[in-house]
């Protein structure tokens, strides 16, 4: 190998490090993902109080010490689960409406994305997203509320743009829409409905009574 070839090889490897090779997650990222996935499942089956860190470690096929290496407490692990789902849902809705311009089409698209996202991630959402914020540990409560508020800002903007008849309270409309769609987590039957059909039917019924 010539000195020039060796130098080129070093530069190539250096460039990869500088730009970041995102072809595969690191071992640490894989381990955290396994822990979060195990926690999602156990928080849903056993509840937050019922699932111990030892249980989560066993489900992730890891030692308890390894779980604590990545998450200093069960509360921080709960936040990781909530943040993962919350950000996925936020980005799903934001991306879905990005190229839409008609106010009602944007609203319908957001409702479909919201419902689809909740039902795609159903096992954890039943235990997490329906839980009132005051039920969360105090150490993470403010973060949960902040992320929830950031998500709801999307719907605040969408509803502000809708042509509604006089007297319709837009805050109540937002709470009604998000609440009704989210409750589908408990009664959804895939052999009977689709997430899109649920969202469209509910919004259509509301629209009939509120549109200007």
How would you describe each model-predicted region?
Residues 1-30, 37:
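N-terminal intrinsically disordered/low-complexity leader segments
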Residues 4-8, 168-186, 197-209:
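Hydrophobic alpha-helical segments that form the core
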Residues 118-139, 156, 186:
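Amphipathic alpha-helical segments used for helix-helix packing
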Residues 68-71, 130-136, 179:
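Short helix-capping/turn signature of helix-turn-helix
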Residues 80, 94-120, 173-174:
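Hydrophobic alpha-helical connector segments
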Residues 31-39, 56, 81-93, 155:
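Generic hydrophobic, amphipathic alpha-helix propensity
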Residues 84-90, 109, 138-163, 170-175, ...:
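Amphipathic alpha-helical packing segments from all-alpha helical-bundle domains
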Residues 34, 38, 42-76, 80:
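Helix-turn-helix
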